[in-house]
């Protein structure tokens, strides 16, 4: 049997970690804004999105780096498209 070695994920450089944190916080803020506009509790959104309420809370606090699948689940739970939910996220600094 041939062994396959996989590199361990390396920590992000500080600038990339800061950028990730900024985007996660902005995304979480949008999720919370849409949820409260619709007068949904965390529990209600979690049920609609088929996610755990603690996970949704962590997303809203900017503590989770979501998969595209979970972004899609949240968008559907809010009755939005992924594009609507991701609109107005911060632009990448210094990139065009």
Go through the PLM ranges and name each one.
Residues 61, 87:
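Short, conserved catalytic or interaction motifs in soluble domains
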Residues 1-29, 33, 37-38, 43, ...:
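N-terminal flexible/basic segments that precede or flank functional cores
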Residues 39-58:
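Short alpha-helical DNA-recognition segment
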Residues 69-84:
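DNA major-groove recognition helix of helix-turn-helix/homeodomain DNA-binding modules
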Residues 51, 90-93:
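Short secondary-structure capping/turn micro-motifs that flank functional sites
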Residues 36, 47, 76:
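Alpha-helical residues within the helix-turn-helix
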């Amino acid at each position: 049997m041939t062994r396959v070695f996989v590199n361990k994920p390396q920590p992000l450089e500080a600038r990339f970690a800061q950028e990730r944190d900024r985007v996660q916080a902005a995304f979480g803020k949008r999720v919370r804004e849409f949820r409260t506009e619709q007068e949904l509790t965390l529990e209600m959104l979690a049920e609609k999105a088929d996610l755990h309420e603690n996970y949704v809370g962590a997303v809203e606090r900017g503590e989770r780096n979501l998969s595209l699948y979970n972004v899609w689940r949240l968008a559907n739970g809010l009755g939005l498209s992924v594009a609507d939910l991701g609109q107005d996220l911060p632009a990448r600094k210094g990139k065009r």
